[in-house]
C-alpha cells in the first residue's frame, strides 16, 4: 500500500497527506503497481467526461475529459512531451539536447508537438460514434500509458542526470514489467475484446521504434522521454483502436 501511495504522489497531483520515507520503499519492484495509478487517472477522466456529457454536447465533454487528465497530473507528462520535442528535434549534439530538455521554457517544437497531440487526440475521440466506448476509452488509455512507461523501463540506460526523477526507476527487474503488461492486456481485452489486444501490439511496436529513436539521439532515456513515451503510447493505442474498429 505504501508503494502505491508513493506512486500516486509521484505521478499525480492528488493531495494525499501521508509522508512516506522513500528509503523504506523499493519503487523498482513496486513499479508493477504503476498501471493502478493509470486506473485512478482513468476513473477521474471517465467521471468528468460522463458528468459533462450529461449537460453539454459531445465535443465539449471530450475536451473536458482531456483537460481532466491535465488537472489530475498537473500536466506532468504533457510538459515532458514538449521538452522531448524541443530537445530531440533541435538538431543539436547530445549534450545540448539534454540541456534544452532541462530548460523550463517551451520552444517552437514543444508548442507544435502539444498542439498536434491534442488535435489528433481530440479528432480520434470524435471519430468514435459510440458514447459508451468513449467513456471506456477515457478510463483505459491512462492505464495503457503506464504500461508503455513500464516497457521503457526494460533494461533502461539513463541519459539524464543522477538527480533526475527518472533515475529512480533505473534497473527495474523484468517481472514487474511483465506483470504490468498482463494487467494492461487484461484491461484492454475486458473492455475492447480482441481488438484491444491487437491494438496493444501496435503500441508495443511503436514503443520499440520510439525507444530506438531516443537511444540513437541521446543514448538512453530520461524523465522527459519516459513521460512523453507514455503520452504518445495512449495516443497510438487510440489510433489503432479506431483503425481496427473501421476494419472489423
Curated annotation (Swiss-Prot):
HAMAP family: CobS (MF_00719)
EC identifiers of the protein: 2.7.8.26
Pfam family, one: CobS
TM annotation in the entry: 24-44, 70-90, 106-126, 134-154, 168-188, 189-209, 228-248
Name assigned to this protein: Adenosylcobinamide-GDP ribazoletransferase
GO biological process terms held by the UniProt record: cobalamin biosynthetic process
EC top class, as a word: transferase
Catalytic activity: alpha-ribazole + adenosylcob(III)inamide-GDP = adenosylcob(III)alamin + GMP + H(+); alpha-ribazole 5'-phosphate + adenosylcob(III)inamide-GDP = adenosylcob(III)alamin 5'-phosphate + GMP + H(+)
Topology with respect to the bilayer: Multi-pass membrane protein
Annotated keywords: Cell membrane, Cobalamin biosynthesis, Magnesium, Membrane, Transferase, Transmembrane, Transmembrane helix
Similarity-based family: Belongs to the CobS family.
Single GO term (MF): cobalamin 5'-phosphate synthase activity
Superkingdom: Bacteria
GO cellular component terms listed in the entry, alphabetical order: plasma membrane
Compartments reported by the entry: Cell membrane
Cofactor annotation: Mg(2+)
InterPro entries: CobS
Function recorded in the entry: Joins adenosylcobinamide-GDP and alpha-ribazole to generate adenosylcobalamin (Ado-cobalamin). Also synthesizes adenosylcobalamin 5'-phosphate from adenosylcobinamide-GDP and alpha-ribazole 5'-phosphate.
Pathway recorded for this protein: Cofactor biosynthesis; adenosylcobalamin biosynthesis; adenosylcobalamin from cob(II)yrinate a,c-diamide: step 7/7
Amino acid at each position: 500500500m505504501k508503494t502505491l501511495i508513493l506512486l500516486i504522489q509521484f505521478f499525480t497531483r492528488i493531495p494525499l497527506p501521508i509522508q512516506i520515507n522513500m528509503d523504506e520503499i523499493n519503487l523498482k519492484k513496486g513499479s508493477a503497481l504503476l498501471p493502478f495509478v493509470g486506473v485512478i487517472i482513468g476513473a477521474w477522466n471517465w467521471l468528468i467526461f460522463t458528468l459533462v456529457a450529461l449537460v453539454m454536447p459531445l465535443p465539449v465533454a471530450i475536451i473536458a475529459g482531456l483537460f481532466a487528465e491535465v488537472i489530475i497530473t498537473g500536466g506532468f507528462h504533457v510538459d515532458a512531451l514538449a521538452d522531448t520535442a524541443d530537445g530531440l528535434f533541435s538538431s543539436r549534439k547530445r549534450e545540448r539536447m539534454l540541456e534544452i530538455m532541462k530548460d523550463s521554457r517551451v520552444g517552437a517544437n514543444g508548442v507544435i508537438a502539444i498542439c498536434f497531440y491534442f488535435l489528433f487526440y481530440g479528432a480520434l475521440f470524435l471519430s468514435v460514434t459510440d458514447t459508451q466506448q468513449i467513456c471506456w476509452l477515457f478510463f483505459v488509455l491512462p492505464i495503457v500509458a503506464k504500461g508503455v512507461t513500464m516497457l521503457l523501463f526494460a533494461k533502461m540506460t539513463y541519459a539524464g542526470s543522477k538527480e533526475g526523477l527518472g533515475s529512480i526507476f533505473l534497473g527495474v527487474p523484468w517481472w514487474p514489467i511483465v506483470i504490468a503488461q498482463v494487467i494492461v492486456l487484461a484491461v484492454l481485452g475486458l473492455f475492447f475484446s480482441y481488438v484491444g489486444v491487437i491494438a496493444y501490439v501496435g503500441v508495443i511496436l511503436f514503443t520499440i521504434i520510439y525507444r530506438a529513436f531516443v537511444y540513437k539521439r541521446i543514448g538512453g532515456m530520461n524523465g522527459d522521454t519516459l513521460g512523453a513515451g507514455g503520452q504518445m503510447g495512449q495516443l497510438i493505442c487510440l489510433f489503432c483502436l479506431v483503425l481496427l474498429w473501421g476494419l472489423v
